[in-house]
Design a protein with these regions (language model features):
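Short amphipathic, positively biased membrane-proximal segments
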Residues: 1-38, 57, 117, 122-126, ...
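An N-terminal hydrophobic leader/cap segment in hydrolases
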Residues: 12-82
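Conserved alpha/beta-hydrolase
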Residues: 120-142
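Alpha/beta-hydrolase active-site loop
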Residues: 146-167
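Hydrolase active-site cap/lid region
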Residues: 186-241, 250
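Short alpha-helix in the alpha/beta-hydrolase fold that links the catalytic acid
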Residues: 248, 257, 271-280
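Short beta-strand/loop motif that positions the catalytic acidic residue
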Residues: 254-256, 261-263, 267
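Catalytic active-site module of serine/aspartate enzymes centered on a nucleophile-bearing elbow/loop
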Residues: 294, 302-319
Length: 319
């Protein structure tokens, strides 16, 4: 009987180790295939992660075409600065001579600064200087891994300081859509200079754990918590942070930066329900805009009048 029990324990242990090894492989695949620069390039070449019927407005709407034309014709500068680790950060910059107002607009996952040309055009025509940074793991970024807006928050603070060093009178607006929204929300949870006057976040998630859980439930029958718990040590090792750290929900609780929370009510990529907890838990001055009928990150493309009316009125309160 003792031998049978011992054998059963050994079999159970071996099965557990085998399962753990499988999940570890899955965790590695998750990190490399979702967050590695090589895979992100491949995703971009395939048209990104969103269904084509939802992403079409990014290329064919009137607002998109105006943004593309702006990007093609308007002269921009290529800027770079260094973070405290000596790593080079890259951005493109539209200069508005004589203006002391700056909009830092952050792109989404599988995007780059050109993805934000519709926002750049609008901010520029409002008379602002516009800085569009490359987020980690994307384009000219010298970081191999994407951190989904977490370590990027520190890069944004470096860009804020870069602007202030050049212009002590600077008034800075933070803006981002999707992962870019996560980036700017995460930044507002840190100690920011008074030069940062407000933040506009468009369809950011509550936490990386919750966002990945939502996506995995749609992709696999394996419980998301098993994959994420297995992937977390790999994320810690390769990216340098715990997946639970990336929580805009916790960051906005510490924020003192007035924030406009925007979300389309037909968003299934970053579910619409995530918007309200972010708004509700923010300790800063805040407003909320729900854009009816808008899918993920599409509000500014398909309902520009509603979008920019709210954004302009919000910014004008703090300039």
């Amino acid at each position: 009987m003792a031998k049978k029990k011992c054998g059963l324990l050994i079999k159970t242990a071996v099965a557990g180790i085998a399962a753990g090894a499988v999940y570890s492989v899955i965790g590695n695949i998750l990190v490399e295939n979702l967050l590695g620069k090589k895979s992100i390039k491949a995703l971009i070449a395939q048209g990104g992660l969103m269904p084509s019927e939802e992403s079409a407005c990014f290329y064919t709407s009137d607002e998109a075409l105006k943004g593309i034309e702006f990007y093609r014709k308007k002269v921009y500068e290529k800027l770079f600065t260094f973070n405290k680790h000596g790593e080079c950060l890259h951005s493109i910059y539209y200069r508005n001579e004589g203006s002391h107002i700056y909009a830092i607009s952050c792109h989404g996952f599988t995007g780059d600064p050109s993805q934000n040309n519709i926002y750049a055009r609008r901010f520029y025509e409002m008379g602002y200087n516009v800085l569009l940074p490359y987020l980690r793991g994307h384009g000219k970024s010298e970081h191999y891994y994407c951190t989904m807006g977490w370590l990027d928050r520190l890069d944004i603070i470096d860009w804020i300081n870069y602007i202030i060093e050049k212009d002590s009178e600077a008034k800075i607006i933070l803006h981002g859509a999707s992962m870019g929204a996560v980036t700017v929300m995460n930044a507002t949870g840190e100690s920011l200079p008074e030069n940062v006057i407000c933040c506009i976040e468009d369809c950011g998630f509550t936490s990386l754990w919750e966002q990945y859980s939502v996506q995995m439930k749609a992709m696999t029958k394996i419980p998301p918590e098993i994959i994420l718990k297995t992937a977390n040590p790999i994320i810690k090792s390769k990216l340098g942070f715990d997946i639970n750290d990336n929580s805009p929900l916790e960051q906005v609780k510490k924020s003192k930066t007035p924030t406009l929370f925007i979300h389309g009510d037909k968003d299934s990529t970053v579910p619409f329900y995530m918007n309200y907890p972010l708004y509700q838990n923010a300790k800063c001055e805040k407003e909320r805009l729900v854009v009816e009928g808008a899918t993920h990150a599409a509000a500014g493309y398909v309902y520009p009048e509603i979008y920019w009316d709210a954004v302009t009125k919000f910014i004008n309160k703090y300039i």
